[in-house]
Amino acid sequence: MSKTANEAMEKRKAEGKLFADTPEWMIKGMIAKTLVGRFNRSWSINIPKRVILEKMIFGSFGKSWIEPPINIAVGKNISIGDGCYFNFNTVLLDDDKITIEDNVMFGPNVTVVTTGHPIYPEYRATGAMYCAPVTIKKGAWICSNVTILPGVTIGENSVVASGSVVTKDIPANVVAMGTPCEVVREINEHDKIYYFKDRKYEDGKLD
């Protein structure tokens, strides 16, 4: 594909139109996946090596921690703040921007997707795809086996329960669950007293 054709696809992608993959993007993806492979094989105690790889892989990466393995598409479209924790098997398909703000927690097997394909099979057969960015606001907790789809924003401090498929925005300070994911309640005073079922916070203080 020529430089002009590649630029045309970049323009279509930026405008939210259907686009197709390009050789240049494929090469960038292969380089990113090679770096991620090195990260996934690194020793947990070799923190300096991991810090170097994180800077090479991601667009920006704060003081956060990833439990390998992790998988990405591009890497440079991902922005991660401070105080975040990612449990095992995180998947970040970042053909568009993924923004993860400070103090976000991921359980195991969380998938964030920015790319989709047409439902109509003849269009899909051409390799056409579309993108929409995903934002996860500060303090959110994404529990295990959650899938977040293109164009979604998760609000500050919200909790998305295990096994949910998030197809639309979730507001701040709520608990949401289900397939498709829906808000079930707000985070409230009860949550200040009980941290799990009948277990009171005063029994679980860390000091």
Sequence positions of predicted segments:
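Terminal amphipathic alpha-helical/low-complexity segments used for targeting or macromolecular assembly
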Residues: 1-63, 181-185, 189-207
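Short secondary-structure boundary/capping segments
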Residues: 10, 56, 126, 133, ...
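A glycine-rich, hydrophobic loop/mini-helix early in the fold
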Residues: 57-59, 64-77
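Structural detector of well-ordered beta-strand residues that form the stable sheet scaffold
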Residues: 65, 113, 175-177
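Flexible, glycine/small-residue-enriched loop-and-beta-strand segment within the central core
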Residues: 70-80, 85-153, 179-180, 186-196
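Short-chain dehydrogenase/reductase
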Residues: 141, 159, 175-177
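Beta-rich strand-turn-strand
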Residues: 143-169
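A contiguous, mid-protein "functional segment" used to position or interact
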Residues: 165, 171-187
